[in-house]
Amino acid sequence: MATRFKHQFSISLALTFFFFFTKTFSFTENEELGNLLRFKASFDDPKGSLSGWFNTSSSHHCNWTGITCTRAPTLYVSSINLQSLNLSGEISDSICDLPYLTHLDLSLNFFNQPIPLQLSRCVTLETLNLSSNLIWGTIPDQISEFSSLKVIDFSSNHVEGMIPEDLGLLFNLQVLNLGSNLLTGIVPPAIGKLSELVVLDLSENSYLVSEIPSFLGKLDKLEQLLLHRSGFHGEIPTSFVGLTSLRTLDLSLNNLSGEIPRSLGPSLKNLVSLDVSQNKLSGSFPSGICSGKRLINLSLHSNFFEGSLPNSIGECLSLERLQVQNNGFSGEFPVVLWKLPRIKIIRADNNRFTGQVPESVSLASALEQVEIVNNSFSGEIPHGLGLVKSLYKFSASQNRFSGELPPNFCDSPVLSIVNISHNRLLGKIPELKNCKKLVSLSLAGNAFTGEIPPSLADLHVLTYLDLSDNSLTGLIPQGLQNLKLALFNVSFNGLSGEVPHSLVSGLPASFLQGNPELCGPGLPNSCSSDRSNFHKKGGKALVLSLICLALAIATFLAVLYRYSRKKVQFKSTWRSEFYYPFKLTEHELMKVVNESCPSGSEVYVLSLSSGELLAVKKLVNSKNISSKSLKAQVRTIAKIRHKNITRILGFCFKDEMIFLIYEFTQNGSLHDMLSRAGDQLPWSIRLKIALGVAQALAYISKDYVPHLLHRNLKSANIFLDKDFEPKLSDFALDHIVGETAFQSLVHANTNSCYTAPENHYSKKATEDMDVYSFGVVLLELVTGQSAEKAEEGSSGESLDIVKQVRRKINLTDGAAQVLDQKILSDSCQSDMRKTLDIALDCTAVAAEKRPSLVKVIKLLEGISSSVSPVSA
């Protein structure tokens, strides 16, 4: 009886626990779902990235975007990763009621608020990543309330002020990343108490001005220490010998001085990367730096180091990148460096090295770049160099190399850049037909003899060719005119004969001088005088015969043309011309481009099968410019090389459509950046953009031949690369599509606010008009306001940005009200006012009152020199 009772009791107890846990699990699951929905409700989600977050029995919340669940023992939310979803709004603490949440990643979004202290309620949270947002304000003392955190990443925001001492109370912290912010002051001693720290990143905080604190040497678990591009000065602490776990040390781009501690190298046996470049360090090469045999990257460049490189560097069997350029190193360059099995990059420019490049360089099978300009290397360039099939850059100008180039010099299938100018090389230039990817070849200032190899014409991507100051003879090969040469310099040789016409028309005369036997248009010798005897000796009969033959051929071709045209009257032809080695088919292009787009100008992003991204600009050629003329005009513009001008990589055309193919820029247009996230562009970046655009405009209108005007400058035609370097686009389109089509394009796609007043009645485009458009772009940079956003005046009239600004600055303290309040600070207000004055001068109604581009550049450079760089 007792046994039966016990059995019934056990069953009852089990059922009780079952129903209890079932109810608990059901309650917890519903609670989790509700917390997540409240968390989502606080966001602005313009792309609908979280549209799948809704209450439905068909989709468990553990399967929602960004949600990861863990069994503990049943399924619970443990991680939320909403990286790069264009989210904004407020960060709610409703997720702190998720009892097992350990990981929260909201990086690469647009959250615009102070550091959310309310998340300190998340008592189980171990990782908090808010990097690459618009987080602003200081790090509060209450940061210590995040007691469970192991990872803090607030990098790439607008966090300012001093690093609080209370940060040192987070004893569990393993990763602290505060890089790319606006922090000031010193690194507090409390950071030295974070004994579990593995990663410390305080880089790119230019106002963090102090010596590197010695207490950092106590962090013996530290594997990454990143202090680059900040305001650190003084010496490298000797206490760093205590960082025995360190793998990456980056102190570059600071103001450090003194020597590298002698015991540092032997102590850091786990070191993989050491970068102390661009400081003011001195002394000798750090001894024992390869004692751990793990070093991959060694960057000592742009300092004041001297002495020789020790042969012990041969112990660096893992070394891939050696950068020691721009120092005072001397002595023989270690032979062992040339045969390291993993070495990829050797940069030793601007030192006083001697020695030779040995035949054993062939053992460096991974070698990609050699840059040893301005040293005292000697001997012959070895046959072994041609056996390195990975080599794509060999730059060794201003040395003492002698002898002939080996026949296999250009056998690397990826070789793109060769500069061996200003040496003592001699003999004939070898056949370089294997260098199919050669873009730049400079052999200037040597003693080469013989003729220019005709095979150079087979190098279809060759863009720069400098053969000046040699002893070359013979004719300039006709085939060279088929290349897209941005530079062709054969001055001071012994060349003779007629210069191919297209080469003469696109070259400065100085690139041909010093060849008295050359003749052609614009040269001292006219080739027609050489044929005078032909006319004197009865060549008229031959001329008449040739004319008759030409007429017969022309008649035949005309008949053939009319016949063929009838057959293909309705058949369109696809044509293309590329200046860089990539493949693009009509199918790939038309897959991206909708042919029913309205006339005007559109930009598409095209992804090739290789993964490379291209920008494609669609234009309408309403004038039906001939194929020959179109090619000539695009080639003229494609030859332009300037760091602030977008490269044209090629073009395609079909019927009345033209597609210009540009290099892709990662950060889009200035217009989009200002509209979307203007406060991500601090003043130093905006000033860099202004100066770059002005320099690009001046280059195309004054330095480049033929002189060009932009005629369509606006913020939407200024693109930004990954470093926010401006790239000018869409200039001189009138040369490509013709004036009529260009005017239609401008009227359809450009707001008149960018257009100079005289453009409405003047028949001639001028530099003053470009200056006016540039002034409007300057106003956008200074005010943060889109030029296309008109306001209504007191009388009901529409005011463009120029009129708006001019009216506002007439009010009391109006100039200060005009400046972009999102980035305005005491440190930049004066410079922003100066730039505003330049913008107002550029947008003067009377063209003659506007400054020249040269003057604008000088004024902007004067402002730029006083601005401290701040990372965007």
UniProtKB/Swiss-Prot annotation:
Keywords: ATP-binding, Glycoprotein, Leucine-rich repeat, Membrane, Nucleotide-binding, Phosphoprotein, Receptor, Repeat, Signal, Transferase, Transmembrane, Transmembrane helix. Residues 27-540 are extracellular. Its main location: membrane. SUPFAM superfamilies: L domain-like, Protein kinase-like (PK-like). GO terms for molecular function: ATP binding; protein kinase activity. It holds the Pfam family LRR_1. The chain crosses the membrane at residues 541-561. It is a single-pass type I membrane protein. LRR repeats lie at residues 79-98, 99-122, 123-146, 147-169, 171-193, 195-217, 219-243, 244-267, 269-292, 294-316, 317-340, 341-365, 367-389, 391-412, 413-435, 436-459, 460-482, 484-506. Belongs to the protein kinase superfamily. Ser/Thr protein kinase family. This is Probably inactive leucine-rich repeat receptor-like protein kinase At5g06940.
